[in-house]
């Protein structure tokens, strides 16, 4: 067990045990309320903010100005197309900047899945996530456990292989569906 904790699981152990204060705020885009909450938090805590997959740059710039943040305090990142890519596209940047603790801002219905995926991916770099839920405007149904598990498995596959296996799995399912 000691060898396992000293080997491949060491970054996860470091992430869980870190007592470092947050060094970055990460907003998973897709909802203006998330971005607004992240901007307000960045202003209050005076932390750098990364918005991944958010609204268009012009609107985001307007929101930044409205919240009194400088462009240098906010990074807009449009590389991600889904929750897994939100983390895989940024985790090396965060590690390179010496970030060990991130405040993760997303909608309350999305937070459990985002924390599952993010903890698997960011944990490989010794980065701990603390969730910051944003209330939905109207009632929002919680995402099912199946979605959380499937994305968690995708994240684990990414950790093991370095790639997202979703396109491969989709192609296999299509191939199986085309059999006579």
Predicted region positions:
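A transmembrane-helix-recognition feature enriched in membrane-embedded lipid enzymes
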Residues: 141-172
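Contiguous hydrophobic segments
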Residues: 107-122, 161-180
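A structural signal for short, hydrophobic/glycine-enriched beta-strand patches
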Residues: 7-149
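Helix-coil boundary and N-terminal low-complexity module in membrane systems
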Residues: 1-22, 36, 164-180
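A general structural signal for short secondary-structure boundary/capping elements
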Residues: 72-76, 149-155, 174-180
């Amino acid at each position: 067990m000691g060898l396992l904790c000293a080997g491949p699981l060491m970054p996860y152990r470091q992430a869980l045990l870190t007592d470092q204060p947050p060094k970055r705020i990460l907003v998973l885009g897709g909802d203006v309320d998330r971005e607004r909450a992240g901007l307000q938090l960045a202003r209050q805590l005076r932390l750098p903010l990364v918005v991944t997959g958010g609204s268009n740059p012009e609107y985001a710039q307007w929101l930044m100005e409205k919240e009194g943040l400088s462009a240098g305090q906010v990074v807009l990142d449009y590389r991600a197309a889904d929750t897994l890519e939100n983390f895989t596209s940024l985790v090396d940047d965060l590690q390179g900047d010496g970030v060990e603790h991130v405040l993760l801002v997303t909608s309350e219905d999305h937070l459990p899945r985002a924390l599952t995926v993010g903890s698997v991916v960011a944990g490989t770099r010794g980065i701990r996530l603390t969730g910051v839920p944003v209330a939905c405007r109207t009632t929002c149904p919680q995402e099912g456990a199946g979605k959380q598990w499937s994305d968690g498995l995708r994240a684990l596959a990414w950790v093991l292989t370095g790639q997202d296996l979703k396109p491969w799995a989709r192609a296999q399912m299509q191939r199986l569906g085309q059999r006579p």
